[in-house]
Amino acid sequence: MAKNRVLTIFYCTIYYCICFKYVLLGMVVEKTQGHICHDYLEGDHCDPKDCNLDCRDKWKGTGTCEPPTGTPLTRTCYCTYDC
C-alpha cells in the first residue's frame, strides 16, 4: 500500500513539473510575440538589394542601408524583423 502511495506522489510531481514547464514556455513566447527586433549585418559596404535579401534570408525581415545619405562604403545594413 505504501508503494502505491509513493508512486502516485512521484507521478503527480512529474506531471506538475511538465505542466509548469509548458506554462513558463508559453509565457516566454507570449512576451516576445509581436515585437519588432533589429540587428546590423557586418560587411564592408551596403548595397540596398543585397541588404534586403540577406535580411530576408536570415530573419525573414527587411533590410535598409543606414544612414541613407552616406556613400555605400560608409553605410551599414540594418535589419528589421519580427521576434
Swiss-Prot record:
The record's keywords, sorted A to Z, are: Antimicrobial, Disulfide bond, Fungicide, Plant defense, Secreted, Signal
Q: What is its main location?
A: secreted
User: Where, subcellularly, is it found?
Assistant: Secreted
Disulphide bonds in the chain: C37-C83, C46-C65, C51-C77, C55-C79
Q: Which GO cellular component does the record give, naming just one?
A: extracellular region
Q: Report the leader peptide range.
A: 1-34
Q: Does the keyword Cytoplasm feature in the UniProt annotation?
A: no
Q: Name one GO biological process term.
A: defense response to fungus
Record-stated family:
Belongs to the DEFL family.
The protein here is known as Putative defensin-like protein 131
